[in-house]
């Protein structure tokens, strides 16, 4: 893959985040990191923000066929190097026990409807509280579906929904979606 990008001659950046192989709640990046808005992301702090975790973060820079590898201290440091200086909203809030528990329940996995508009599990109460503290209005899915709440009246929001079987199987809000054709985001 790297050679393919190098053959294109334009500038490319690839960030590789090593993930734990166990438990299964770390199956892919969406389980520890999700873009919420142009300036904010949902992050599982022990893996995405901390240094010396034992899991490598590699920034691969490809420019005019030249390939350079840079080891970064953490994932958000790597995103900052490529022009995305993100403010993290912490999965599970500031408490390490809640972070671990809510990450296990797909607390970092959200489906983005648009800029600052996301869907996620209501069960991750500390994560939802962290989103609310970061300026996201909290809307219940049943209120949106019944017409009691209008999503369009909110600039930034998280729609929370109840679920039991999908989280038990290890899936998050994004895991339930099929590809969505969206308009290009000019970041």
Q: Where are the model-predicted features located?
A:
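The feature marks the mature, well-folded catalytic cores of soluble enzymes
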Residues: 1-187
């Amino acid at each position: 893959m790297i050679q393919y990008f190098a053959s294109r001659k334009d500038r490319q950046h690839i960030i590789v985040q090593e993930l734990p192989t166990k438990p299964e709640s770390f199956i892919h990046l969406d389980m520890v990191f999700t873009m919420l808005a142009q300036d904010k992301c949902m992050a599982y702090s022990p893996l995405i923000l901390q240094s010396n975790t034992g899991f490598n973060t590699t920034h691969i820079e490809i420019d005019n066929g030249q390939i350079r590898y840079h080891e970064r201290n953490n994932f958000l440091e790597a995103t900052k190097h490529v022009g995305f200086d993100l403010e993290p909203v912490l999965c599970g809030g500031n408490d390490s026990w809640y972070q671990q528990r809510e990450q296990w329940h797909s607390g970092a996995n959200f489906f983005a409807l648009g800029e600052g508009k996301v869907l996620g599990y209501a069960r991750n109460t500390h994560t939802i509280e962290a989103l609310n503290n970061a300026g996201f209005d909290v809307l219940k899915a049943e209120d949106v579906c019944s017409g009691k709440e209008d999503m369009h009246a909110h600039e930034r929001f998280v729609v929370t929904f109840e679920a039991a079987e999908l989280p038990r199987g290890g899936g998050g809000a994004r895991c339930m979606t099929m590809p969505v054709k969206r308009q290009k985001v000019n970041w």
